[in-house]
Curated annotation (Swiss-Prot):
Reactions accelerated catalytically: a 1,2-diacyl-sn-glycero-3-phosphocholine + H2O = a 1-acyl-sn-glycero-3-phosphocholine + a fatty acid + H(+)
Keywords in alphabetical order: Calcium, Disulfide bond, Hemostasis impairing toxin, Hydrolase, Lipid degradation, Lipid metabolism, Metal-binding, Platelet aggregation inhibiting toxin, Secreted, Toxin
Species for this entry: Acanthophis antarcticus
Keyword Nuclease: no
Family annotation (SMART domains): PA2c
Name of the protein this chain belongs to: Basic phospholipase A2 acanthin-1
EC numbers, comma separated: 3.1.1.4
GO terms for biological process, alphabetical: arachidonate secretion; lipid catabolic process; phospholipid metabolic process
């Protein structure tokens, strides 16, 4: 679920940035998304959005699906491989958290979602 995703983000970036920092970033971080991603971090969010879209096609409610995971050496690790939905959603979130941790964060890309760059 989204709270667990927030925990994974903190795990992967060693607590350097809260998940709230990503809510209104670029064209894809936060609710919805459109246009061309503005940078690598926004591309991570687009990939995560697409992954959630695939989860919804599988009848998994990704925003509300709880799963089991742990933080091992600053890497989120999923434990729910037996449940198709839980495992899929956990993998989406873990991949995005790792992607966020590697991508540069550009403060100039906060709050641009309503601008023409995201049309």
């Amino acid at each position: 679920d989204l709270f667990q995703f927030g925990g994974m983000i903190g795990c992967a970036n060693k607590g350097a940035r809260s998940w709230l920092s990503y809510v209104n970033y670029g064209c894809y971080c936060g609710w919805g998304g459109s246009g061309t991603p503005v940078d690598e971090l926004d591309r991570c969010c687009q990939i995560h959005d697409n992954c959630y879209g695939e989860a919804e096609k599988k009848q998994c409610g990704p925003k509300m699906t709880s799963y089991s995971w742990k933080c091992a050496n600053d890497v989120p690790v999923c434990n729910d491989s037996k449940s198709a939905c839980k495992g899929f959603v956990c993998d989406c979130d873990a991949a995005a958290a790792k992607c966020f941790a590697k991508a540069p964060y550009n403060k100039n890309n906060i709050g641009i979602g309503s601008k023409t760059r995201c049309q």
